[in-house]
A protein has these predicted regions:
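Extracytoplasmic electrostatic interaction patches
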Residues: 82-175
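Hydrophobic membrane-insertion alpha-helices, especially the h-region
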Residues: 9-25
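Intrinsically disordered, low-complexity segments of exported/surface proteins
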Residues: 6, 14, 28, 106-110
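A general marker of short, structured functional hotspots
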Residues: 20-23, 54, 63, 161, ...
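N-terminal export/targeting and maturation segments
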Residues: 23-105
Length: 175
């Protein structure tokens, strides 16, 4: 009789242990998902981008929302999503955010030449720094300047695209 009680106790312990493992992973998944939603609701843009791009977890959702990310194999190899392509008024690439901001890259035509544009944006998507490059006649990349009004116009487009991205992702995830 005592052997059966011991055996029952061991089965209960084993069952609880086996139940604890999936419970831990389910809790961890819920906690990560709620942290992303909380970042969305607090309008912490850099935190949202960081969480969306930290792994392949949200890649299918980003694709479903109509944005372009690398293939899952490349994401696993890189340890996260290195860039998201946003097709809109301009074709914008945003990189995995740093601690305080995000980099936006796009190409436009200025004065009949293709110009590569690089914007460093802070947590509010305000401009921290900008760089403009064109390929000259000798196939050498050279820095160019653009009028302040043009820079402000482009910045507004970039900010609108990023805000639309954030809104679309929130609707896709929590709709």
């Amino acid at each position: 009789m005592s052997d059966k009680v011991k055996q029952l106790k061991w089965l209960i312990v084993l069952f609880l242990f086996l139940l604890a493992i999936p419970s831990y992973f389910a809790y961890n998944h819920f906690r990560q998902s709620s942290a992303l939603k909380e970042a969305f609701e607090k309008n912490e843009r850099i935190e949202v981008l960081h969480r969306l791009m930290a792994s392949e977890k949200y890649a299918p959702d980003i694709r479903k929302a109509g944005y372009v990310v690398p293939p899952d194999g490349a994401i696993r190899l890189d340890g996260g999503i290195d860039s998201i392509e946003i097709k809109g008024d301009i074709d914008l690439d945003i990189s995995n955010p740093g601690r305080n901001g995000v980099t936006a890259y796009f190409r436009i035509e200025i004065d009949g030449k293709i110009t590569s544009v690089l914007y460093e944006l802070d947590k509010n998507f305000d401009l921290v720094s900008s760089a403009y490059f064109q390929i000259n006649e000798k196939n050498i990349k050279e820095s160019v300047t653009i009028p302040k009004a043009e820079e402000e116009r482009l910045l507004k487009i970039v900010q609108k695209e990023l805000e639309d991205f954030m809104e679309t992702m929130y609707q896709t995830l929590y709709g």
